[in-house]
Amino acid sequence: MNDFISSLNNWQALYALSNTMLSLANSGQWDELIEQEVKYVTLVEAIARNPIEPDNSVFQEKARELLTKVLANEAALKIKLQARMEELRVLIEQNGNQKSLVSAYGKLSGNVLMPNDFNQ
């Protein structure tokens, strides 16, 4: 019975942590979110090591409900992470463009160009 309770406690902790992670993503706290990922994986591993036995239908149903909620949070989190990855991709692209401009026009810095310089 204690193993069942321990396993169900892990499921509840996983759901609570998934709520926390989604909240962190919603508020843009990406570093904190990454820190929570390690705890999340550890809980998933603990659940895998200590599954709820098939003959305990009450605990299995509770775990199933929690799993459904966790999966919904994961789906929402995935959408947030994809949006963040797109933001970072745009920033990296802009940085690359800026470096190209600096490289191209930096060679001309310190030079005064006169209109007739372009005709030669």
UniProtKB/Swiss-Prot annotation:
It holds the Pfam family FliT. Its main location: cytoplasm. Residues 59-97 are annotated as: FliD binding. Keywords: Bacterial flagellum biogenesis, Chaperone, Cytoplasm, Repressor, Transcription, Transcription regulation. Residues 1-50 are annotated as: Required for homodimerization. It is found in: Cytoplasm, Cytosol. GO terms for biological process: bacterial-type flagellum organization; negative regulation of bacterial-type flagellum assembly; protein folding. One of its GO terms (cellular component) is cytosol. InterPro entries: FliT (IPR008622). Homodimer. Interacts with FliD and FlhC. Dual-function protein that regulates the transcription of class 2 flagellar operons and that also acts as an export chaperone for the filament-capping protein FliD. As a transcriptional regulator, acts as an anti-FlhDC factor; it directly binds FlhC, thus inhibiting the binding of the FlhC/FlhD complex to class 2 promoters, resulting in decreased expression of class 2 flagellar operons. As a chaperone, effects FliD transition to the membrane by preventing its premature polymerization, and by directing it to the export apparatus. Belongs to the FliT family. This is Flagellar protein FliT.
